[in-house]
């Protein structure tokens, strides 16, 4: 069996594809981490973010929303100098703002996991694509998720980023049919 065509020979990318991408994630804090990381890739490749993921975790308190939400402008100033992450002020500020929006949702009785999964009726959607060209970059579900996140104050959550998030967190499974990770193909 082969892997999806977007996977390079980089061992980090292979491990991500084989063990994380498309696997349903139901932990609210992990989903929070992923929506933040997906926003960091805007205009860049995912491998760039993936290679910096451990640095992001260190800089953003393992994506603990309470600790991230408490970060201030001096933290932003420090982080824009940190070569271990993408030094884009707006993206750094977005993570902090997204933590605050996440906490507001939780405080309002809207668990992030339930909110996110509601856009696929709490069931992973399996695409039956045989080639990468058949896989969309956005859908009506990612459009709706993007709109709803923005309404709640999230940033860097356009429809394409939301669709990448949905793929990464297993809301949709876009492994191509011939991929070793397509449902039913794993030993």
UniProtKB/Swiss-Prot annotation:
InterPro entries: Adenine_glyco, DNA-3mA_glycosylase, DNA_glycosylase, Tag. Pfam families: Adenine_glyco. It catalyses: Hydrolysis of alkylated DNA, releasing 3-methyladenine. One of its GO terms (biological process) is base-excision repair. Keywords: DNA damage, DNA repair, Hydrolase, Metal-binding, Zinc. Gene3D superfamilies: Hypothetical protein, domain 2. Zn(2+) binds at residues 4, 17, 175, 179. GO terms for molecular function: DNA-3-methyladenine glycosylase activity; metal ion binding. The keyword DNA damage applies. Activity is controlled by product inhibition. Its EC number is 3.2.2.20. Hydrolysis of the deoxyribose N-glycosidic bond to excise 3-methyladenine from the damaged DNA polymer formed by alkylation lesions. NCBIfam families: PRK10353.1, tag. This is DNA-3-methyladenine glycosylase 1. It comes from Escherichia coli (strain K12).
